Amino acid sequence: TYVNYRLWLGSNKKIIEKLEEKYNVKIDKSRKLEENVFVDIDEEFEWPDVNNNIYKTSGKCYGIRDHVGILVDGSVVPCCLDGNGSIKLGNIFESSLDSILNSKRALKMVEGFKNKKLEEELCKHCGFIEKINKN
């Protein structure tokens, strides 16, 4: 388990000051604050939402490959940006993580990302995917 504070550049001065005070460090870039606690300061991107104006069918992503999210109700989602559980792969209270990650839907997403194909509708509307595919 770890904590990652995600902050946008320029708009979180008070939060950064509080974190600097708590962890007794100067925060001017993304960094480790202590064991399993990080701060990520970056340019703002549009949060995934099927109702936004972003629409891409191709691109790479680190979701499900490098990390997953587990919501409070036990829903396993492919990334930390799916806070509403739009892409529920399974439930950790009902199935093992291994079986969830080896489900047909999860494997289809992994294969799609390998081939730079976005399989899920939410992924097609993700501003973070736009951001990482610029690099």
Please provide the spans of the model-predicted regions.
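Short Cys/His-rich metal-coordination motifs, predominantly Zn2+-binding knuckles/fingers
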Residues: C126
